[in-house]
Design a protein with these regions (language model features):
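A short, N-terminal "cap"/entry segment at the start of jelly-roll beta-barrel domains
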Residues: 1-28, 157
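N-terminal regulatory/effector-sensing and dimerization cores
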Residues: 19-127, 158-164
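ATP/adenylate-binding site constellation spanning eukaryotic-like Ser/Thr protein kinases
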Residues: 57, 255-258, 295
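Residue-level signal for well-ordered alpha-helical positions
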Residues: 90, 113-114, 180, 264, ...
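Short, Lys/Arg-enriched, Trp-marked, Pro/Gly-tolerant hinge/linker segments that flank
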Residues: 123-145, 152-219, 224-225, 229-230, ...
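Terminal helix-turn-helix DNA-binding modules in bacterial transcription factors
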Residues: 207-215, 220-232, 239-282, 287, ...
């Protein structure tokens, strides 16, 4: 898509640095990445393009889906085509972000490529409909899915405006978006709820609970605390978390603790300090959980 640079000249560059000129143009591009740098900015968007907004420096604020959301580094916001939202930034120093705009043609090409990959379809069954997918709109952590991890890999090169094969970059972003979308759809289908809108809102809250676990799994995490973060009752949280993710919150905490334990034990930390750091009641309970998970005591794991 043709854009106007700061001097008013047209450009077809796939990565464009923009600031105040964003006030004057509609934000419904196709297959372009906008690197924004703004201090005092507000804009109402009445018809957006399909976009992935990646936080970089500072905080961007949006009024979207009848609520205010904040976007920071380590997060991205997914917005479907033809949506409305408001964006506002007030900061003494520039706030920077990257926005990936993807065309319907690109999404279709990526979906066609995935449909020819039998192995990938076994892991991420594609829907049979030819309709453009409606992606789940929310703030995602970049460490929670394939798309986020790929965006984080791209960030340094984008920030430095390095020369990249942008045709491949756009195709890879679209492919990761679709695989992440299909995984999300699988998880949402597990939730026992008739209405799609209710299921989506429940899934958003469950993702909040899961991220709370990721941020606090080394602490003495209580179910009441987790339910409060997700705005759900304890029993509703327990039931729907297992339906969506195939694991209970307690099992999720234990998995994360033991995964980190393998690294700490391998680095030579004492078993008592590992148990203490990861929130186990004592060395004995840590050793028992480790052996049950990996089939050997942590001391043998270290020796191996």
């Amino acid at each position: 898509m043709t854009l106007l640079t700061g001097n008013g000249m047209p450009t077809r560059q796939p990565l464009v640095r923009m600031s105040e000129q964003l006030r004057q143009i509609p934000l419904n591009f196709d297959d372009v990445i906008i690197h924004s740098r703004l201090r005092d900015f507000d804009k109402s968007v009445g018809d957006s393009g399909l976009s992935i907004k990646l936080g970089h420096i500072g905080t961007e604020r949006y009024f979207f889906r009848n609520r205010q959301v904040s976007l920071q580094r380590g997060e991205y916001l997914l917005v479907n085509r033809h949506q409305t939202f408001d964006c506002f930034i007030r900061n003494p120093t520039p706030v920077e972000g990257f926005c990936f705009y993807l065309s319907p043609r690109l999404i279709q090409e990526a979906a066609s490529g995935l449909s020819r990959n039998t192995e990938d379809l076994l892991d991420h069954p594609a829907p049979k409909s030819n309709k453009a997918p409606r992606f789940l709109e929310k703030i995602y952590r970049t460490d929670e899915n394939e798309l986020g991890r790929y965006l984080e890999q791209l960030r340094p090169a984008l920030a430095a405006h390095q020369q990249l094969d942008f045709n491949q970059v756009f195709f890879d972003v679209a492919t990761a978006l679709l695989r992440t979308h299909w995984r999300t759809e699988q998880e949402m289908r597990g939730i026992d709820c008739a209405r799609r809108s209710t299921r989506e809102e429940l899934y958003r809250r469950l993702c909040t609970a899961r991220q709370y676990i990721y941020d606090n799994y080394c602490n003495d995490l209580q179910l009441e605390e987790l339910a409060k973060a997700a705005l759900l009752s304890k029993y509703h949280l327990l039931r729907t978390y297992k339906q969506a993710f195939g694991i209970t919150p307690y099992q999720q905490v234990l998995e994360l603790r033991l995964h980190k334990a393998t690294r700490l034990v391998g680095e030579g930390d004492s078993l008592s300090s590992v148990a203490r750091e990861l929130g186990f009641s004592d060395r004995r309970s840590f050793t028992k959980a480790f052996k049950k998970k990996f089939g050997m005591a942590p001391s043998h794991y270290r020796a191996g």
